[in-house]
């Protein structure tokens, strides 16, 4: 299903589409807070230790983001999540484990995952599935990242809600939001055959649904790459 506002949104994005998609270096100017679970992992940037998580890094390109690493003893990174908070602000969350998969990786049938996490606040109005115009710059960059750095990789686009509302409504809304993001990425040149659309409703919450702040983080759409 193509969102009702998609043609208008594509018009807004056309200039960026013509200027950015063919470059070999994707610009990604962001203030990034690096976080680890468990806490206090050693953070390395461009091969040098910059202290323990949480810590802040300013980046200018996707290569800069790729060069941020975290180490926690003999534990493995089982999930890496870039939580987009605004077009110029994000958290990079390293989740560690020992010989295990994250629950989401298990259900998707992959070992580890790199997740681009778009909260409802960034991408959608409450209970809607039309993309916000403010979300387009970062989704343009997302498409460029997929086309330049992961041109053949399978990509999961997954939607989620909080625990309020009925299961039926939440599943339907989460799927429509995932489809809206996928349609936009395809319009930006990502091969639709690579995209797998999933709607999980309230499942796989990243925070507790007991608080407004937690529910806000659970209302999200993710672009997920197997690692």
List the predicted regions and their residue ranges.
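Periplasmic OmpA-like peptidoglycan-binding domain that tethers envelope proteins to the cell wall
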Residues: 158-227
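Periplasmic peptidoglycan-binding/tethering modules of Gram-negative envelope proteins
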Residues: 60-69, 73-154
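Bacterial Sec signal peptide processing site at the extreme N-terminus
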Residues: 22-35
């Amino acid at each position: 299903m193509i969102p009702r506002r998609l043609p208008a949104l594509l018009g807004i994005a056309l200039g960026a589409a013509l200027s950015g998609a063919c470059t070999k270096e994707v610009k990604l100017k962001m203030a990034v807070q690096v976080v680890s679970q468990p806490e206090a992992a050693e953070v390395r940037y461009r091969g040098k230790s910059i202290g323990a998580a949480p810590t802040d890094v300013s980046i200018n390109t996707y290569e800069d983001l790729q060069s941020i690493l975290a180490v926690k003893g003999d534990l493995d990174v089982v999930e890496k999540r870039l939580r987009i908070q605004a077009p110029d602000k994000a958290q990079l969350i390293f989740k560690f484990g020992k010989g295990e998969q994250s629950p989401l990786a298990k259900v998707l049938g992959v070992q580890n995952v790199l997740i681009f996490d778009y909260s409802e606040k960034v991408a959608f109005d409450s209970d809607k599935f039309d993309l916000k115009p403010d979300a387009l710059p970062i989704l343009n960059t997302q498409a460029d990242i997929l086309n330049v750095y992961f041109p053949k990789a399978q990509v999961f686009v997954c939607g989620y809600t909080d625990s309020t509302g009925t299961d039926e409504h939440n599943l339907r809304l989460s799927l429509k939001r995932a489809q809206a993001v996928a349609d936009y990425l395809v319009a930006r040149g990502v091969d639709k055959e690579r995209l797998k659309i999933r709607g999980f409703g309230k499942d796989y919450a990243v925070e507790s649904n007991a608080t407004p702040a937690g529910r806000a983080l659970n209302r999200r759409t993710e672009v997920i790459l197997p690692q």
